[in-house]
């Protein structure tokens, strides 16, 4: 299983104070020196709430690890990434809503302009991945447009697992739609969400598409996904950075790697 470390929220801490620390390149080399991280993931959002254009340039220039850039189909971002001298190892196209706290679901594959953006990256020799819900129609869209990799949105699975097996439902930011569900309901919905991820990962494999997954994964809910042999990569960020605040980035990375690289 490949471990993609998302370092967005290291930069979030920097941007809160509009200062120079924490240094994104220091985080990059801490990750690299663990010898457990396979790629670095960043999300270049339209509102630049964390990662900035300059971060992209610096990372691509110096990174010894592959860089996966998440972004919307925004024309300015597409033009910027296509113009780069140092190319990312892949671009993962994600849905984006400026009012969202974090990505809320998979990509709408009927989105106007999506096909043109995929073509633009392919024309520059940049691999494209699509951040999608685990649905067969989305996989067929990927195959039809020569997209060789997808990342399944695991938010539904992760939220259900957290509600059932942690104290998430008793926290200040508990998800209201899950608070009133019984443990039996949560368990059934979680099982169905897991089965859907497993089915679609297998479907992707038979289509010749590499299946990755990410969103909301943490040190508890990630373990079950290791039972899906067709999954090849997990992208994890917030939970690792959250733990790093308490125990340090190196230790946080190593603890996650110990779980997913068994």
From Swiss-Prot:
Disulfide cysteine pairs (residue numbers): none
Catalysis: reaction(s): 3-amino-2-oxopropyl phosphate + 1-deoxy-D-xylulose 5-phosphate = pyridoxine 5'-phosphate + phosphate + 2 H2O + H(+)
GO biological process: pyridoxine biosynthetic process
Enzyme Commission no: 2.6.99.2
Binding site for 1-deoxy-D-xylulose 5-phosphate: 8-9, 45, 50, 102
Protein family membership: Belongs to the PNP synthase family.
Protein's recorded name: Pyridoxine 5'-phosphate synthase
Organism: Helicobacter pylori (strain G27)
Record gene name: pdxJ
